[in-house]
Amino acid sequence: MVTIKTQSYDDFRCIADRCPMTCCQGWSIKVDQNTCDKWQKDQNTAYLMEYTVSRGEDVPREMKTNEADACLLLDNQGLCKVVKRHGDGYLCDTCALFPRKKNQITELNDVDEEKVLIEEYSLSSACPAVMEMLDGLESSLGLEVKGECEDGIHFPMEYRVRNTLICMIQGESIYHEFSLTERIMLGFSLLHECLDCDTEENVDDCLEVYADIENLREKMEYWEEMEPAIQDTMEELCQTFWNVTEYYKELPMYRPYVYDAACKVDSWYPERDTEAAAAMRAQAYGTWEQHKQKFAEYDSLAQRILASEIFSDCISDDLGELTEYYQAIVLEYIMTRMSIFLLGDYSKEKVQLYYSLYVRIIGHNAEGMAEYWEENFEDSILEQEYFYLLLS
């Protein structure tokens, strides 16, 4: 069996009270049954069950939260009371494992038993400490490989597609010729063509086509000829921003990050248009290209984040679902770029923080995003033209 880890996996350490966006606030913290049993069996920790709530017989219990959506066991210094009083060994799996991720690549053997071919270990970029580690890497994401596969192993089709996406995003080999947004678009184009394939052999043929530099150049020439109007691009970006943040902008955890930007979008596109709103939009149109150039200074970080998230999340055995995950990962990039534009703060700390924010909002809610696309576009797989518009 082969084990693959992202370069920084073993180096991760929680920064606890120094974290600018704690993982103890803003989402549900599931408490696994083994932890519940462990707490209840020890008279010193039995009281911890009072800080949990049941959501139903067939689902794990959750930690109770306060009005700010923070875990009740988070103290005023940003430290966990469970760890302070009882040690790391009494954390529930959710808290002990985050932001670590583990995936297994499997196949069925001759008697239809599942056999593990590869175990992959990675870190979620929703954690600001992980984001800092990604920023500190000198080049690509970096994968540490141990072990060997048996001869004759046939890796799943979706796994081969995912690995091609990672190579694309990181600008490896022939993909180095293209900009980050071009590589993102080529990846989406590849997925669309794979979805149209009838057989696995056709998918392999498609992967070969996307290893041909002349074919890639032709595809980018096609997209560049579209030249979407800045008015259309800005309107769709603002609409997307508004839709994604509508729920979160009023939540205590997320309001400080997205409320002001959402208000700016509202002022650009009021229910009844005004001359003042039109003037603000015109100013935005005029500075968009300059913004993209400034944000591109963080392309090396962005490509590592994208590659890391693709490595972690695009592991479905269904190409359609894999494409939905890819869309969500790219939307994290689009939303971060748009937020920085709206706020006008291009500091490294701000870019990292907003990237972590949108990995939480979007990446950890991929199923919800698929439902959103289905509801608004009548298909959870976006059209390529619309995808290109958002990247423009």
Task: Go through each PLM region and give its residues.
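N-terminal cysteine/histidine-rich coordination modules
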Residues: 1-78, 82-92, 97-143
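Short, charged N-terminal helix-start/capping segments
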Residues: 2-19, 161, 246-265
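Hydrophobic, aromatic-lined core segments that form the binding pocket/scaffold
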Residues: 180-392
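Residues that form generic nucleotide/phosphate-binding pockets
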Residues: 38, 42, 164, 168-171, ...
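Charged, amphipathic alpha-helical linkers/stalks
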Residues: 125-220
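Alpha-helical structural motif
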Residues: 31-35, 123, 157, 161, ...
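Short, exposed beta-strand "edge-strand" segments with a Pro/Gly-rich flavor and a Y/T-containing core
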Residues: 24-31, 170-178, 197, 341-346
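Conserved aromatic-histidine-acidic binding/catalytic patches
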Residues: 83-87, 115, 153, 320-328
